[in-house]
């Protein structure tokens, strides 16, 4: 543990073995866990509020959750487990709210092929998660000759009719969040960071990068009120991009699209042509261990279907996995907040096959990087989903007591060797 939130803290530095107040190390770690989950919920709630959607019940939980971690309020480990599970439930509620906000505003996502590569002309690259910021940027760049490209978690924006209607939404440049320094250095474009997943910029593009909303970087101009005039002016000043050879990615598989295939999916499963579904995704990590997810998907047999979401998909979304009688073997469900689509899909499959969720031909292979993934993990645990795999490493705040609880109650398993894990899952 490491706690220094009150004046009693040991030597005025930190309590690292046991709190002077009596707080046990596991309680301290569970408090951290709750705060991480609350941070994740707050990110999704922020983006819903951008579009005018709020939830008083979620707001009230955030107040109670934060308050519970104050000094001398709650010393009960079991209560903090319950609060973490409640945080998972509140995160599901928040993701549903954000999904409604996105669909009400931009329409139901549709499968869409996205160009990956530059076109000739001045350019702006938008990174992060804010569809609202992207929409305002597209409005303000109409008729300017500027091509707007998405990066990382804004890729799914191309699937929304209300955003795809802008012809100058030109495609995608780069991949996951951690490639941005190379991507932004490579292209002479103006850059907009709209949310989390921005990195401290290199000097060679710092003067052409801007932030908005919650994002902020030292030495980078922050734009208030969605007024992107300085960003647009910078894009027009810079040398235009040259057209380059391009590839394509497919995104935009909303729940309704998948449910339209329900009868065919049931037929293929009952006929043994689809053996199992694998939900492989989450936050990507630059750790070498994250190569596991690439190898895992590459080694899956051809009678399996891969569902993916968030930036973890960049580990394998360029693979051509083909289809099984018209059902794509690789289905991109969207951003990390679109984990709600995965949750709803699990429930839909349970109804389709009249099975308990833990009896479904479905395995979940999670990758995590930061606090939003912690919120999503507790969302899945709140549904009593068992047998999930998690990587690239176990969360650092989970000590032996917490790991034992997760293993004993939910059969949560650290990723191992891809081939061995597949063999174990498929029997």
From Swiss-Prot:
GO terms for molecular function: 4 iron, 4 sulfur cluster binding; hydroxylamine reductase activity; metal ion binding; peroxidase activity. CDD domains: HCP. It catalyses: A + NH4(+) + H2O = hydroxylamine + AH2 + H(+). One of its GO terms (cellular component) is cytoplasm. The keyword Ion transport does not apply. It comes from the Archaea. This is Hydroxylamine reductase. The gene is hcp.
